[in-house]
Amino acid sequence: MSEHFFCSSLSNIKSSDWNECVGNDHPFLQYEFLYALEKSNSANTKTGWQPYHYIEQENDKIISLCPLYIKNHSFGEYIFDHSWADAYHRYGINYYPKLQSAIPFTPVTGDRIVLNKSVKDKKGKQVQVINNIIQEAKKINVSSLHFNF
């Protein structure tokens, strides 16, 4: 039986567990890179990149993950959605905070929903992860959910 949760810091996760799921194909998804952003205070609440990573475990093994950040602005995304924020504001709706899956400060492409190679039903697991993240987005009352690059 698997369980999922959201974590506000990678310091709560073992680097070997994270990297086993990620593999070697995406260096910007590696634990060391993302955690360095946290440790250097580049990705935190003050900079508008509050980590809120999705992690699913089964038998103490990470079987899926998604790097997520609670964003209070659109800086450092390489997506220019300021007009969206302005439109929300004109209609009296808050655009921020939003929940975003991205690699901070870089437009690098790659997987955002990462599945352990042991997962058999890849499509089914991706749908489950997305549904879990959507439920959490509603629960924490963010305006929207974004997946970049």
Tell me the role of every PLM-derived stretch.
Residues M1-F149:
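N-acyltransferase acceptor-side catalytic subdomain
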